[in-house]
Amino acid sequence: PANIWIVYTQSLTEVLDYISRATNNEDFYEIDDDGNETDTVVLDGDGKPFRPDAIVVDGTSVLNLTTKQGIIEFSKKRANVKADIAGLIGDARLVKVDGAGLELKDYQTINFKGQDLILALNASGKHYIVTARETDEKEQRIIDGKKESVSTGRKIPEGFKGMQYNCKTCIRMYRDPDDYDTVKAFV
């Protein structure tokens, strides 16, 4: 028994379910080797049902990626329906379905899912930490008459767009370029 419980998942839906259980003081159940819940309640170090004081979501970048993958699969199904309605066959159908990608409305859905994650953590009453990889902030500029994406020189969390705006504190950790063993941080 311990006072830390680690759950491995790449599913945003599962993460939101665990946050909901923590918020509502519900029991957690041990996971078997196949990833299925058992009937065995997870216990803390005192033998009581486990109730987290803090939640760590390590990998919003991965959750964002898997969310996008799921929506792309849905987009292919959406394209399949459109191809059926249009009566497409052969290469035309193949291009329509296999070429399906994220549409503008899909990006908005993904961003809402990311905000749901942060807002669920805010409402949980638990301490929380959310990690993300970082990426260069980019802006659109017209260069030689063409619209191009240009780095601003700032680093931002890679993952759900705008998730940092609902967090109380953002810490950017980085290695000192002159001393790789030293980790520094911006708050």
Model-derived features: positions:
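Phosphate-binding/switch region of NTP-binding enzymes
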Residues: F112, L119-V187
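Conserved inter-motif catalytic segment of the P-loop NTP-binding fold
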Residues: P1-F112
